[in-house]
Amino acid sequence: MEIDLDSIITRLLEPRTTKPGKLVDLAEEEIRYLTVQATEIFINQPILLELEAPIKICGDIHGQYYDLLRLFEYGGFPPQSNYLFLGDYVDRGKQSLETICLLLAYKIKYPENFFILRGNHECASINRIYGFYDECKRRYNSKLWKAFTDCFNCLPVAAIIDEKIFCMHGGLSPDLKNMDQIRRITRPTVVPDFGLLCDLLWADPDKNIQGWEDNDRGVSYTFGADVVESFLKKHDLDLVCRAHQVVEDGYEFFAKRQLVTLFSAPNYFGEFDNAGAMMGVDETLMCSFQILKPADKKKLTNDSNGRPLTPPRNKQQKPKK
């Protein structure tokens, strides 16, 4: 069949004018087209993106499609603004398919203005369990889930904005000594159980520690403010920008404003009363925040499905630091 990208985007945007939770039915061939075309672009762009401000940065979405549309209403629909998303598009919410399809469609339509990084949920071993596989199988088939897996294995994993703001989904890594280590990661790749790529997608800051400690998630590490400070100094950077953790106001600073956590799914999972946030970076690298207040509780886009909040992960033992 002839695939019309603009028609796909138009249909994906229709729920803007309907009630939250309305499903968008794309043809399976259209979704496969999105995964294949986007993969080609990801592979042809660097795994460590070098981007320029102005840009808007968003944290976890987790299938809360109506909230993704609200973010675009606030920030301007592409190509009105440049965007960088920090991962975790799927799982937990009810509309992972619409969410990832719109993001891939915009990536194909505006490859130099619209960027998405890999989160720890863009990984088959995680999204097999936490909702995305079930959604693909229920609405289409498990082969389509495999097509997304192949696409996710090619996503970029970090970005640097104007040589000053270092962005990733999770956090820093004790193995990260220079940026070329990231550039040398070859794709397609699965997320390993430990090491640099794992940490970029899984690590968390912790205000109660110094240095590195094992992470309660059972994967990767936590790191103290001292780690952030010395990392920024060494690499002549100003800010680490990451996602991966629910924060009450949608954004939260750490280490004397040298690290910021962004989370863009308000009322996360139907169980939290958090706001969502998007960070705007202007040409002078001034950062400002747009807040999505928690919407009313009757919203249909969140659903707990009784899934635990922190995914345990079957893994080999990682080396001690």
Swiss-Prot record:
GO terms for molecular function: metal ion binding; protein serine/threonine phosphatase activity. Mn(2+) 2 binds at D88, N120, H169, H244. This is Serine/threonine-protein phosphatase PP1. Residues 298-321 are annotated as: Disordered. The keyword Hydrolase applies. Its EC number is 3.1.3.16. The gene is pppB. It comes from Dictyostelium discoideum. Protein phosphatase activity in vitro.
